Amino acid sequence: KMNESQGILIDNHVSVFSGPFQKNDAILFRVNEGTKVEILVWENQWVEIILIDGKKGWIPAETLRKL
């Protein structure tokens, strides 16, 4: 995989969105602080992530710390 990098969530109860925008009807699921994720895309203040179980979505960049 190109540019494979990992991150860890540093905010409690991070909402994961269907795209790089913050809308209530776009929330797919939530993840807890300390969850490790793989970073797919970094776009402005948003990051597309994938979880170990294959769930994907977008989170605000400030909720993530690169590992």
List the predicted regions and their residue ranges.
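Long, non-globular low-complexity/IDR segments in eukaryotic proteins
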Residues: 1-6
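Short, solvent-exposed mixed-charge patches
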Residues: 66-67
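Short, Lys/Arg- and Gly-enriched loop/turn segments at beta-strand edges
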Residues: 44-51
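Extended, charged low-complexity segments
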Residues: 37-38, 54-56
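Beta-loop motif signature
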Residues: 9-39, 43-44
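A short macromolecule-binding patch
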Residues: 55-63
